[in-house]
Amino acid sequence: MAAKPTPSVSVHIRLTVDPNKINEFLEISRPMFDAVTAEPLNTFFEMYRDDKTPGVFKLVENWDADIDYMMNVQVKKEYYTPYHTALREILLKPHEVELYSRMPGNEWAKLDVKRYVDQE
């Protein structure tokens, strides 16, 4: 008998930071990144930047959770409060959040672990 698939969700957050405050953004993001990646249900977290538009970042998080958990449990974690408070001072516009449920099975999944060899 096959195991019941675990729910999985991908969270994509677009942030538009004042280009003069990028270093401050990275500094205030580190404690949040460390807290999120320490969560047992977090399976992936990467930050991307838009090379054509300074100050635009995309955070991509993958979770072994469903959207209900993300909206009713995860977003209420205490470590987000100081992060969001600090962000208000440097964002040029409100952040945008998109949630996606993972396709079932592994037909549409691949991970090249060699790309992450420097991770502890």
Curated annotation (Swiss-Prot):
Domain ABM: residue ranges: 9-99
E.C. no: 1.-.-.-
Gene3D superfamilies assigned to the protein according to its UniProt record, in alphabetical order: 3.30.70.100
InterPro entries the UniProt entry points to: ABM_dom, Dimeric_a/b-barrel
Pathway: Secondary metabolite biosynthesis
Domain of life: Eukaryota
GO MF annotation: an example: monooxygenase activity
This protein's UniProt keywords: Monooxygenase, Oxidoreductase
Role played: Putative monooxygenase; part of the gene cluster that mediates the biosynthesis of dibenzodioxocinones such as pestalotiollide B, a novel class of inhibitors against cholesterol ester transfer protein (CEPT). The biosynthesis initiates from condensation of acetate and malonate units catalyzed by the non-reducing PKS pks8/GME11356. Pks8/GME11356 lacks a thioesterase (TE) domain, which is important to the cyclizing of the third ring of atrochrysone carboxylic acid, and the esterase GME11355 might play the role of TE and catalyzes the cyclization reaction of the C ring.
Descriptive protein name: Putative monooxygenase GME11364
Provenance organism: Pestalotiopsis microspora
